[in-house]
């Protein structure tokens, strides 16, 4: 019996059957069953790769847009700074010119006085005119002299150079202006340098 089986295995038909036989099962069938499960996983990975690429491209585009916007803002800032510097310079020149213009007539009269050959009285009158013009020029710039002689001493606007004993005027009244003081509107430019009275009778009373 075994010899007969052995002989059948040696025939061409038996050899083909032996080659097609699978003692451990059918591997082809098992592989065919695994392929459908692997295909969805590969599809998921492919979609993830595409999503990451899209995010990368979007990030690169955002970075380029940000760099362009930053460059534009920097250019606008530089232009604004240059424009502000130019306007400041023009305003300063205008202010200086406006101030100097008020004193040009005063300078003209000084030059005329130097060239004058008149008498001492005429020269004095010319100087008085120049002083008046100077005062008007200062007032046109809102620069006002501080009141002194006859006013009560005010340490906010007066600086006492000396106290002089006087009984005919109130104590601490300004009796002499040594140097004129000025203010521009309400702001003090410089205090007036003055001499003030010291009335001992009023002090004792």
From Swiss-Prot:
It comes from the Bacteria. GO terms for cellular component: cytoplasm. GO terms for molecular function: adenyl-nucleotide exchange factor activity; protein homodimerization activity; protein-folding chaperone binding; unfolded protein binding. Residues 1-40 are annotated as: Disordered. Keywords: Chaperone, Cytoplasm, Stress response. GO terms for biological process: protein folding. Transmembrane segments: none annotated. It is found in: Cytoplasm. It holds the Pfam family GrpE. The keyword Transport does not apply. CDD domains: GrpE (cd00446). Its main location: cytoplasm. Homodimer. Belongs to the GrpE family. Participates actively in the response to hyperosmotic and heat shock by preventing the aggregation of stress-denatured proteins, in association with DnaK and GrpE. It is the nucleotide exchange factor for DnaK and may function as a thermosensor. Unfolded proteins bind initially to DnaJ; upon interaction with the DnaJ-bound protein, DnaK hydrolyzes its bound ATP, resulting in the formation of a stable complex. GrpE releases ADP from DnaK; ATP binding to DnaK triggers the release of the substrate protein, thus completing the reaction cycle. This is Protein GrpE. The lineage of its organism: Bacteria, Pseudomonadati, Acidobacteriota, Terriglobia, Terriglobales.
């Amino acid at each position: 019996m075994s010899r007969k089986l052995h002989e059948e295995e040696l025939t061409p038909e038996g050899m083909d059957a032996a080659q097609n036989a699978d003692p451990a099962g059918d591997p082809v069938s098992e592989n065919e069953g695994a392929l459908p499960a692997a295909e969805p996983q590969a599809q998921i990975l492919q979609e993830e790769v595409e999503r990451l690429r899209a995010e990368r491209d979007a990030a690169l585009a955002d970075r380029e847009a940000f760099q362009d916007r930053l460059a534009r803002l920097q250019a606008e800032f530089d232009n604004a700074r240059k424009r502000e510097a130019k306007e400041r310079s023009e305003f300063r020149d205008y202010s200086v010119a406006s101030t100097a213009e008020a004193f040009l007539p005063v300078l003209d009269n000084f030059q005329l006085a130097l060239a004058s050959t008149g008498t001492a009285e005429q020269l004095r009158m010319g100087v008085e005119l120049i002083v008046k013009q100077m005062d008007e020029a200062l007032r046109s710039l809102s620069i006002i002299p501080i009141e002194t002689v006859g006013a009560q001493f005010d340490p906010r606007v007066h600086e006492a150079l000396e106290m002089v004993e006087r009984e005919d005027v109130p104590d601490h009244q300004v009796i002499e202006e040594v140097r004129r003081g000025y203010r521009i509107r309400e702001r003090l430019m410089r205090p007036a340098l003055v001499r003030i009275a010291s009335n001992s009778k009023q002090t004792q009373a």
